């Protein structure tokens, strides 16, 4: 199945009224169901031209999906590893789990403690450190 067919199938699943439309508030859920992981800021940017009560057709949704998909491709594993490597004090590819938790809950699009617990689960070693490359790959592939 190609991306557009997947997109149409998931879009139809979220069409609760049977009018071949989804609400603006559902856009993020549909994108996530399609394997995307947009930030709330990205979603807001994509739907900002629509009224909050608007219902989007599939034709309205496709450019949003394509935009988010393209943005995701721009961010590579290497870029995220490089960004986190600035916090690698020992130069051994590891970051302290407490410091990583602090970064994830205070910078950029802040994550909740529960989300961070889920992300970090199983990634820290016996010394309280996380392998940066392994962590980034696991997060990007989830």
Curated annotation (Swiss-Prot):
Disulfide bonds: none annotated. GO terms for biological process: mitotic cytokinesis. CDD domains: EFh. Residues 2-37, 75-110 form the EF-hand domain. Its main location: cytoplasm. Disruption phenotype: Arrest at the 1-cell stage embryo due to a cytokinesis defect characterized by a failure to form a contractile ring. The keyword S-adenosyl-L-methionine does not apply. Keywords: Cell cycle, Cell division, Cytoplasm, Cytoskeleton, Motor protein, Myosin, Repeat. GO terms for cellular component: actin cytoskeleton; cytoplasm; myosin II complex. It is found in: Cytoplasm; Cytoplasm, Cytoskeleton. It comes from the Eukaryota. InterPro entries: CALM/Myosin/TropC-like, EF-hand-dom_pair, EF_hand_dom. The keyword Cell cycle applies. One of its GO terms (molecular function) is calcium ion binding. Required for cytokinesis and embryo elongation. May regulate myosin II complex formation and/or the association of myosin with actin. May be involved in the organization of mlc-4 and nmy-2 into bundles. Myosin is a hexamer of 2 heavy chains and 4 light chains (two regulatory light chains and two essential light chains). This is Myosin-2 essential light chain. It comes from Caenorhabditis elegans.
């Amino acid at each position: 199945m190609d991306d557009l067919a997947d997109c149409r199938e998931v879009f139809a699943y979220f069409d609760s009224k049977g009018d071949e439309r989804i609400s603006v508030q559902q856009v993020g859920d549909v994108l996530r169901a399609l394997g995307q992981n947009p930030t709330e800021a990205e979603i807001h940017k994509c739907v900002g031209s629509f009224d909050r009560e608007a219902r989007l057709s599939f034709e309205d949704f496709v450019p949003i999906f394509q935009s988010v998909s393209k943005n995701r491709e721009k961010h590579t594993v290497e870029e995220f590893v490089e960004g986190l490597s600035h916090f690698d004090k020992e130069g051994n590819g590891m970051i302290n789990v407490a410091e990583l938790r602090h970064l994830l809950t205070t910078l950029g699009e802040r994550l909740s403690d529960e989300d961070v617990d889920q992300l970090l689960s199983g990634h820290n070693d016996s010394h309280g450190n996380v392998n940066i490359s392994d962590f980034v790959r696991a997060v990007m592939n989830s």
